[in-house]
Amino acid sequence: MKLRRIISLALTLALVLALTGCGSGEKKTTVLRFGLEVAPDTVTCKAAERIAAEVYERTNGSVTIEVYPSGQLGTQRDYIESAMLGIIDIGYTSIAGLESFEPEFILYDIPFTVFSSEHAQALWDSEQSQAVQQKLLEEKGLRTMCWLDMGPRNVYTTQEVRTAADFSKLTMRLADVKGLINLFDALHASPQVLAFSDIYTGMQTGVVNGFEIGLASVLASKLEEVVDYCVETSHTYTIDCFFMSEASFQNKLTEEEREIVLDAFKNGGQWQIDTFQENIPVYKQQLADAGVETIVLPEEEMQKLFTMAEPAIEKSIAGIYDISIVDQIRDMAP
């Protein structure tokens, strides 16, 4: 009986030691939470999924990025604040969304300064841009991982606009953004603040007769159904970005994993840019098929708009940048 007990205890101890050994040898797995407001079928969300897949594969599963689309983790502002507090690890925002936390991000949103994807890339890579991103990292603990191409913002309207003077015909739906309101006020349009969700009804009922957003957003919300013209103003070029909590980047990842994550975001960001640009002809054809005429203003009329916009531009950067920044950004065009 005593022998049996000794054998039983020995076997139990051996089992415990074996299990302990297995536990100590288990591979560390780091889970990073990634919040996006956009739907799963968007190019932006697909880019996030590609990044997650590349990181998982290249780290052999030691780093898993869980992507939460469609606002499951909140709004863009929530992502920024949560990443600063370490509640989530990675987020998505428009560059405009960062201006509330670091005013110098207005650099990317100054009207009539960026006119193409290549131009946006040059701005993102510029010394001025890198300084702003470094300031965000040092003061807010947020690391920008890559920029995302959302294309130019144009004017969509029921009114025929072929000259700078024609902008006075427009009652423009605008987001409650001071810079946009100042801009269209300077262009002699009548600004009207409405929620994005109210654009369709506002156009149908005549509360407004124009609005400004990117083409992909127009089609996603079927707003081509309530307009007759697209006026290619390219008054701003929308740049979004993926960002990461610096605390998560430094404390949750090994040096090798950090390099893999940085590389994956670089690859995923470039894929998003390339894919978005490839889709633009498709988007434009969809707009034309819906019966919307695209108007390209003559160069002299665009120059008039630039001149009219100068007071609004000065207001938007007052106390942040000298007016010389406008020409500096324009001169970055490839």
Name each region found by the language model.
Residues 1-31, 334:
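Short, low-complexity disordered leader/linker segments with a strong preference
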Residues 23-119, 128, 137-139, 143-334:
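N-terminal secretory/targeting leader peptides
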